Amino acid sequence: MSTNGDATKVVVIGGGVSGLATAYRVMKADPSIDVVVLEANDRPGGKVRSVQVGDLVLPSGADSFLARKPWAVQLCKELGIGDELVAPGATGAHLWTARGLVAMPKQAPFGIPGDIGQVFSWPGLSGAGRRRAALDLLKRKRKDDSDETLGSLLRRRLGDEATDRAVAPLLAGLYAGDIDRLSVRATFPDLQRWESWQGSLIRGAQAANRQSRKSDPGPMFVRPRGGVDRLTDALTAELGSSVRTHTVVYAIDATDGRQRVTLGDGTTIDADAVIVSVSAHEASLLMEDLAPAAAADLAGITYASTGVVLMVYAEGSQAGLPDGTGFVVPRGAAPMTAATWLSSKWPSDAFGTRAVARCYVGAVGEEDILDAADADLIAACAKHLAALVRLPDLPQHAAVVRWPKAMPQYELGHLDLVARIRRSLPEGIFVVGQAYDGVGIPDCVRAAGEAADAVVAYLQRDPAGISNDEETVR
């Protein structure tokens, strides 16, 4: 707590989902704390935002979030927008192959079939690839329980063909990453548990399906009606004047047992705690002088640059789309890494009979495409879609949104790296965000709650070792 009689102040640097949710949780835990959120851009929300494409407003960031991780859904309910949550109007996805799109197996968690019959009819694989994948049921499990790459686990269990053609396009796409560098423990720990407990990924998928049928989990993905922006807008409304936009932070220093945040205009804010919720490379620059060891480790978290190409087609074009919500692409096989049919996924939006597509471009090892001009990116994606499905050669309206250094890479050793960063931070400094504990919105919300709890506990400590409650009693 502040020792000079002023209100206890907490500064949150960064107004994305993580920063807003952490500030909200701190404010709710102790309304007496003066919380201020500093956001460099003209609006909070981070990568959760929409853009105008013709007469439509379309998501350039997340268009939904995982409902089976409950934290974002719970936050929506807490904010009074829980009754606005809607599920997609279509389900299922396709896999790109050289011969066209093929439907991905149903009831295949993480893209892995839970039935041997599905394995031997696995779309997109050769007979040899299917037979190799089926050996997962016979191969001995790994005895060493240390971390390994996602690619190492998948290739050992299912073989290269099933890994590269069928599973990696889905899993690696979520991180825009390289499966042979991503940590399985930091990205998809369930896969490691499946091998350990079931001795097989196929049996693990089968067990997951049985559990899912027992628990009736409901829709896998949801969003507030009107878009995910509703969540960040609701958080911003709750925080009110605590959120300051157009505010660049230059540095963080420690002085007299408190933290001092220096802004880009040279003014300073003294705080009892600072929560850093910007990218790891930005956090590294802020802490170069204050915590050089932490800064060096933060700089070691690499990022992939990505982008989206949003395309609105003419009236009547929706009929040319296949069933499902879109497709994923094996590494390097097409200009895009995946595509979503927004008009199929969210039919309640005002699309009419127009097909609306969102193509994802850029990933680790595939970032050069982002150097292309907007018109060339649009033309490349549109040409590829027209060859795959019954769409016109070009959309009526289109937009390109680039996200430079946007997706943190949870490479082998990521969990140890994050633990080391947090151990080396000075007292009163906390980090939270996509770079540390999960890239999806539910994981960011969960981590925000944990960070807020840690901040409040830190502020309520007594330097003499006596809790505030004990001091009050005395």
Name the predicted role of every residue range.
Residues T247-A357, A363-A372, A387-L388, S467-R474:
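Mid-domain catalytic core of redox enzymes
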Residues T3-N4, T8, S50, P105-Q107, ...:
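Conserved flavin/dinucleotide-binding core of flavoenzymes
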Residues G54-K141:
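Dinucleotide-binding Rossmann-like beta1-alpha1 core, especially the glycine-rich loop
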Residues T8-V37, V456:
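N-terminal Rossmann-like FAD-binding beta1-loop-alpha1 element of flavoenzymes
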Residues A87-G89, T245-T247, D253, G433:
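Short loop/edge segments at beta-strand edges and connector loops
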Residues R131-A251, Q259:
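Active-site/ligand-binding neighborhood in enzyme catalytic cores
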Residues M27-G54:
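Glycine-rich FAD pyrophosphate-binding loop
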Residues S18, R43, H281:
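Conserved Rossmann-like nucleotide-cofactor binding loop
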